[in-house]
């Protein structure tokens, strides 16, 4: 199938799917074609994702989940991205999503948006509200985290895990 989330064609990224997410067309076309494909991509990535993280990605509705912190580090030539997230519901609280051996990190839009307009969580000021998370596995794991206000984060990595 190739990489659905970040298809490389001649060196250019094709991100029509995430841009479509923020339009009125999404509600009309997503149930028929895109959501089933996104679910298939997540199922194919399941073998590479720890069970607790897979449960979070598969069953959670992200509109009440917030990114509190984004940290990018490099150690021994490997890049690591950590996102601290918080969900309003008590079952998740604060957790850290860790992306190991990151070979690609891209942000579309400002990482921090002063004009962000969403209901704030009770504990602190977040970087953004997570609208959805898409994961796919081809040669590497590819993750697209869609934030409010047409912003998104892309990562291509060897491993994803959930830290508490």
Q: What residues fall within each predicted segment?
A:
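Surface-exposed, interaction-prone regions used to assemble/regulate multi-protein complexes
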Residues: 1-164
């Amino acid at each position: 199938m190739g990489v659905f989330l970040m298809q490389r064609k001649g060196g250019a990224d094709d991100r029509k799917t995430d841009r479509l997410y923020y339009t009125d067309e999404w509600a009309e076309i997503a149930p028929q074609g895109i959501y089933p494909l996104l679910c298939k991509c997540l199922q194919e990535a399941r073998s590479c994702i720890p069970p607790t993280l897979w449960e979070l990605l598969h069953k959670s509705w992200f509109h009440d989940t917030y990114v509190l912190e984004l940290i990018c580090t490099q150690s021994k030539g490997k890049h690591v991205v950590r996102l601290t997230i918080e969900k309003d519901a008590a079952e998740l609280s604060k957790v850290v999503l860790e992306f190991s051996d990151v070979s690609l990190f891209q942000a579309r839009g400002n990482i921090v948006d002063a004009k962000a307009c969403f209901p704030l969580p009770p504990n602190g000021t977040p970087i953004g509200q997570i609208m959805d998370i898409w994961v796919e596995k081809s040669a590497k794991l590819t993750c697209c985290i869609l934030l409010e206000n047409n912003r998104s984060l892309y990562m291509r990595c060897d491993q994803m895990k959930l830290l508490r």
